[in-house]
Amino acid sequence: MIYDYIVIGAGAAGAVVASRLSEDKTKSILLLEAGPDYPDFERLPDELKFGYASGTDVMTSDHNWQFLGQPTPIAEPMLVPRGRVTGGSTAINGQIFLRGMPEDYDTWASLGNTEWSFDKLLPYFRKLETDLDFSDDFHGTEGPIQVRRYKEDEWVPITKAFKESVVSAGYPMSEDANNPDATGLSATPLNNTKGIRWSTSLGYLSESRDRLNLTIKADSVVQKIIFEGKKAV
């Protein structure tokens, strides 16, 4: 079969790109993923479904490429977890849904590409999320990825003690770390609700995988891309 678009990798970017492209019913899309795909949420392995998997659970999993990196010539090699499953690294990471500071994006824009300014990116931040805690101009309410923060009465004792020590030292509290004016201590925004990890597979592909113009082919390792000039053939 001939496809209009072939997307390699169903991770943080690929799952989104394929899902968005398939919104055009006149185009056919093939999404290739080296790792497995789990169309049925009920059969999703616990290490991917729930947000508690860490350490050995992830490091030794078949859903992780298990890359090794060496930060310096004399340092011991270290594991660099990267997802090998639909959802990519969003299926195995720490689920911290924290934006950068506006000044950082504006600095990028000042280097030549004005599309990277905070004001230009904000609509996409909002489109990405359904923030269950905030619904102001800086947060989305209809996006595919659900975001929440643990309320203070849900914090474990050590977290409460840390908060008390920080406040007693004179640092301010902030309700929302993703507010552009935020400073001080704040609960971390997470793409995890009720213990469920909202990866791009769950957030994006669950909405698009039944479209007739989108084919998801898992366990498919791409060896190379053949180009003619600047065109992939």
Q: Where are each of the predicted segments found?
A:
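N-terminal redox-cofactor-binding region of secreted/periplasmic oxidoreductases
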Residues: M1-V233
